[in-house]
């Protein structure tokens, strides 16, 4: 047990020294973070770019007052470069970040063939200015997420319209004259419940025979909702890898003309007329260009999990060191697997 050896100042009774001090707390502490950051700036890129695919994914991650810019090999799933900012990124920050990566490629004689990003307006001009006329693909998942959100919102609007048509009665059992209206009210209420419980069927990509039967049942008497489902089927067909970009753009033009004939749908599906949808079809002409930015999003999700399970108070240097440690861990993953496999084989005899 620790014993006091210093005279307490004043009347507060504070301990100024101890004959047996306890070790420092290691909560939220991880070895090697500072050294990891130094190694990332020295020799990590040489190994990471040794099998560079030529395709990258770029994205930004917001962590409180900080923002993390990341570039990941979109086919090898390796984080290549990152930068921690203490403010929201601007076009100048994106330009400087991309120039750092372009200098690293030029120093090793490598060329970039394609970039995948989200729909942020900060990327297009910076990509053209730094990398030249490379293929720029917008993430397919971001585009589909906006469209599915609009369709779900349209289904909710139909539910509200049905709720407004419900007849109102006084308390108690309906009279003989209102029995038919009461039965219709009960049927409409059940349809509203079904539309809510099965709303995912309007945006799900593939439907089973049972799900198709359910969809036909809950949309009986609601042709607008059946049209919404048909439009979603056409949207999914746009991203079929068997098509070329020109073919998909022709399909998109026909789909837009069809939607324009419905005044209500034209307003609801405004995202269908966004130019970002056309940029999301660039990957159809290049079989190696990934359609999504899942490679960089995966690292962002792991960072979010680390926020919840490892540390709470974050500083800019701490975030940078943690990311560097994770990058080194990924770089050593293959070696750890080979070591584990060798030990298992040796143990098995």
Specify the residue positions occupied by each region the protein language model found.
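Extended interfacial segments that mediate partner engagement and assembly in macromolecular machines
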Residues: 1-5, 9
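RNase H-like nuclease fold core
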Residues: 4-5, 14-133, 153-154, 295
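Alpha-helix initiation and N-capping motif
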Residues: 5, 22, 140-144, 155, ...
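Short hydrophobic/aromatic segments of transmembrane alpha-helices and their interfaces
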Residues: 8, 46, 283-284
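Alpha-helix boundary/capping detector
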Residues: 34, 38, 51, 55, ...
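Short, solvent-exposed secondary-structure capping/transition elements
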Residues: 80, 153-160, 208, 336
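Acidic/histidine-rich catalytic cores and adjacent linkers
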Residues: 106, 110, 117-125, 131, ...
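Conserved beta-strand -> loop -> alpha-helix junction used to position metal-binding or nucleic-acid-contacting
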Residues: 115-121, 126-170
């Amino acid at each position: 047990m620790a014993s006091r050896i210093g005279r307490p100042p004043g009347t507060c009774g504070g301990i100024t020294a101890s004959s047996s001090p306890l070790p420092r707390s290691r909560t939220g502490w991880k070895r090697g973070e500072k050294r990891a950051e130094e190694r990332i700036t020295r020799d990590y890129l040489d190994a990471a770019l040794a099998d560079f695919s030529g395709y990258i994914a770029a994205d930004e991650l917001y962590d409180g007052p900080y923002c993390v810019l990341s570039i990941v090999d979109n086919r090898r799933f390796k984080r290549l470069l990152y930068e921690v900012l203490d403010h929201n990124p601007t076009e100048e920050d994106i330009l400087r970040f991309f120039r750092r990566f372009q200098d690293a490629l030029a120093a090793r004689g490598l060329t970039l063939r394609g970039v995948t990003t989200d729909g942020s307006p900060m990327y297009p001009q910076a990509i053209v200015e730094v990398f030249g006329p490379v293929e720029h693909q917008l993430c397919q998942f971001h585009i589909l997420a906006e469209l599915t959100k609009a369709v779900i919102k349209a289904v909710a609007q139909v539910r509200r319209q049905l709720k407004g048509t419900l007849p109102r009665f006084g308390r108690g059992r309906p009279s003989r004259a209102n029995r038919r209206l009461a039965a219709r009210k009960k049927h409409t209420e059940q349809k509203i419940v079904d539309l809510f419980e099965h709303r995912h069927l309007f945006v799900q990509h593939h439907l089973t025979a049972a799900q198709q039967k359910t969809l036909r049942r809950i949309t009986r008497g609601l042709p607008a909702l059946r049209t919404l489902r048909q439009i979603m089927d056409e949207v999914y067909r746009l991203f079929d890898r068997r098509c070329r970009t020109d073919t998909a753009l022709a399909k998109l033009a026909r789909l837009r003309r069809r939607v324009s004939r419905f005044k209500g749908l034209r307003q609801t599906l405004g995202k269908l007329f966004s130019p970002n949808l056309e940029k999301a079809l660039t990957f159809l002409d290049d079989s190696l260009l990934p359609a999504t930015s899942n490679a960089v999003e995966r690292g962002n999700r792991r960072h979010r999990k680390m926020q919840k399970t490892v540390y709470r108070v974050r500083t800019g240097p701490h975030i940078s060191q943690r990311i560097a440690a994770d990058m080194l861990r990924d770089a050593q993953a293959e070696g750890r697997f080979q070591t584990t496999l060798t030990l298992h084989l040796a143990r098995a005899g």
